[in-house]
Structures are given as structure tokens and as C-alpha cells.
Amino acid sequence: MRQSSKAASFKEASDDLEALAEVSISPTHLQRLSERVGKEWAQQRDREVQAFREDKLVCAYAAAPPAAAVMLDGGRLQTRAEDGGRGVQEPAWRENKVACCLSLSSTEQAEDPQPEPPSKFLEAPRVARLAAEVKSRGRPALGRAEAKPAASAKKRRRKKRRRPASKKRVRTVVASMANSETFGWQMAAEVKRRGLDRARRKACVCDGQQYNWTLFELHLLPWGFIGILDFVHLVAYLHDAAHAWKKDRGRAWKQYVQWLRWAWSGQVKPLMASLRQATSDLGEPPQGAADSDPRQTVKDTLGYIQNNRTRMDYARYRRLGLPTSSAPVESTIKQINRRVKGTEKFWLDGGAEAILQLRAAYLSEDDRAATYWARQRPYARAVGAGRLRAA
């Protein structure tokens, strides 16, 4: 099951098992086994969710971690009609939702441990690449076409790496094709099972998607979690807006750096005031303006910050030893996407949900898969039983 959930396809998993373990199992048979086990694990998850909703879920850990973080995001995969016969009928892109639940080791400090922005946010080529990657699924970016890393014959001096304010202890993963409401309960049950709700310092780090913050306010805010806007997504917006406002590249970069420093230190008021000035200078975008229209870019950035201004006190978050980046969940989604996303992959809903449960279990660092295997499995007819004729 591990290789079935990790390899890029059932065919690749079948080949790996043949080559590495000398186990011969067809891709079709492996798919059936994976769907069956994945559905069993989904049923176990649903039982835990029901126990949580009935206030009967038992925490699996005696001691609470010193700090915790929950990070939410979504990936994408393609589905097809359930009863469409052979071939792909009614293909559609669907979102799979993912949560990373992290216990952290960190300390609270009286002063901001890193008052200056990291160098990666102050180097134009790196920022351009970073912004392009973050916004690649959205509108075309301004000021990026010429942004290429400068060639240099000299090797850069190796900089002393700053130790992160918080260090991950254990990661567990929740992934599902369910709607937002159902997924919210799945995420909350995992937080409760891990005892992350009892951490003294805890954060929910997300990008600006509204449904993420709806789940935060419903499930995590009552437990005292602090909502934090992912700083890297904010950098992408600031980079785009600066190049939309200032046509000269040098002036645009200078404007971006000023906005970056305000954002890094949590000074939201001057940042919003400057963006309002940019909006006034450029004027309102016409109805139906393209996302790449400079007026629309600046307006979108101002709206993004207005909607998330209460989640941008970054200096305070660093003092509390909390993360300000949702990179762990984005990395997890890349690992999941390798298995489920592709132009040639079209899933039925049940198959997608099953493989997500397998992938989430094996990506979790609490031996969840081993725990599931140790439980008595429900009786079911063997996969492939009755297919052989009597002699």
C-alpha cells in the first residue's frame, strides 16, 4: 500500500514491487487493493470524526506540545463520471483539501528575534521567481519576464543560516475530497486527537482563501489559535503591485522594499495608506478588466491586505515562536499531487478519496499507517475471489 500511494501510478508501483521486492502484482489488482484499504481507513477516520462531534474522542497524547500549528491549503486533481462506461466521460478539475497538523519546539521571546527581512526577500531575481511560483495559478505577473538570476563567476560566500524560530516535531496530514464543512470537522478531529488544542502557543497559517479562514473561525479560533497570513503569498502580492504602480524597474523595486519592511514589522496602516495612494494614482480599473491590468493588480493587493489585516502582526508572531509561512502544507501538497495530479489521470470520487487516505497516512509521522494495520480489518471478500474457474 505504501508504494501504491507513493509511486506516480499503479503501473509504476507494480513495476517497483516486481523489481525491488520480487512481488508480482498487476496494476489493476493493486488498484483494487488500494481502493479497498483506503476506504477502510476513510471509515476509521469518519468514526473518529463522529466521536469528536459527540465529545467522545480520546486524545492520543498525555502531554500537550509547547507550540502547535495547523496549515490549510488545497491541491487539484481530475475526476470523471461514475457511470460513464469506458473512457473518460465528463472530465473536471476538482480540489482536494489538505491540512498539516504540526507540533513545534519553540520558545517565546521578549524581543523580535529577526527584525530584518531575510535576504531572500531582498534579492530581485529570487523575489521575482518566488512571486511567479506563488502566483502561477493566478494572473500573469508584471515585472517578471526579464527577472533572471544574474550569472556570476565568483562563488557567493556561504551565509550562516539562521536557526528557525520554530522547529517541527511531528507532522500529521489530513486530506480529502469532501466539501469544506466536512473537511473542517476532519481537521478539527485530528487537532483534538493530537492534543494540539492544548498547546499554549498555537497558530493557523494559511493563504488568503476565504474558506480556510471560515474553518479557522469555526474550529480553531475557539481553542485560542492565532490566525496568520502566509507571508510568502503576501510578498507575491506586494511584488506585483509595486511593478504595476511604478513603471521604472528601479523605482518599483524601491517601492517593494518599503512595503516589504512595513509588512515584515507588522505595520499595516502605512502599508494600506501607500496602496490607497497607488490606487488613487492609477485610477479604478474598468469593469471586466484583465487580472494583469495594473489598476486591477493594485486594487486586488489592497483588498487582499484589507481582508487579512488582522493576521499580519508578524513581529508578534516571531516573538511567540510561531511560523509565518505555510510552506509545510505546500510541500505536502506537492507530494500528494505527484500521486494524484496529471493530465492523464482521471479519478472516480471513491478512488480519489481512497488514495488520499493512503497518501495522508504514509506522509504522517505518527505511525498512523502502522496503527491502522494493527487493527482488526473488517471481513470482506478477497479481491479477485471467484475469478478462477473450477478445475
In which residue ranges do the predicted regions lie?
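Catalytic center-proximal scaffold of phosphoryl-transfer enzymes
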Residues: M1-A391
